[in-house]
């Protein structure tokens, strides 16, 4: 079970390695990209319910998304000892997500890097050990 404050919002999660490849491509041809802004998205919009289903599929155990209000989430994290900064940051990201700021998809990762972005299921499969480790440890 994972309580998060994203409601039913849809967004297209992008893998860090895809972001890294985009950054490398831009740095390798900085003149071509000077002054440009690139909105980066993963390949498919998902809700947190769908993310939980993918986690369940890959990890082999039931993962349930529990939507909570942003304020309640911040309080839960406060009780867990998280800093005011991270609580404010996640709260702002959650509000932006609910407001549709992260909605949409595009093909910029592939256009800029020559590689299709990772699907979430592939990312979780590739990094399955990290998700298992997260069950055994809790860092703030």
Segments (PLM) and residue ranges:
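Oxidoreductase cofactor-interface core, primarily capturing Rossmann-like NAD(P)-dependent enzymes
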Residues: 1-64, 68-71, 75-86, 92, ...
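A hydrophobic C-terminal alpha-helical subdomain
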Residues: 71-140
């Amino acid at each position: 079970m994972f309580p998060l404050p994203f409601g039913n919002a849809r967004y297209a999660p992008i893998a860090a390695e895809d972001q890294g490849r985009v950054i490398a491509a831009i740095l390798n041809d900085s003149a071509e990209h000077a002054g440009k802004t690139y909105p980066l998205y993963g390949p498919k919009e998902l809700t947190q319910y769908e993310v939980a289903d993918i986690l369940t599929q890959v990890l082999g155990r039931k993962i349930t998304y529990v939507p909570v209000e942003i304020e309640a989430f911040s309080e839960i994290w406060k009780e867990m000892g998280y800093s005011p900064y991270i609580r404010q940051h996640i709260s702002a990201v959650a509000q932006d997500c609910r407001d549709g700021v992260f909605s949409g998809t595009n093909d910029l990762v592939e256009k800029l890097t020559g590689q299709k972005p990772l699907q979430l299921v592939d990312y979780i499969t590739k990094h399955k050990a990290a998700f298992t480790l997260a069950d055994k440890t809790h860092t703030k």
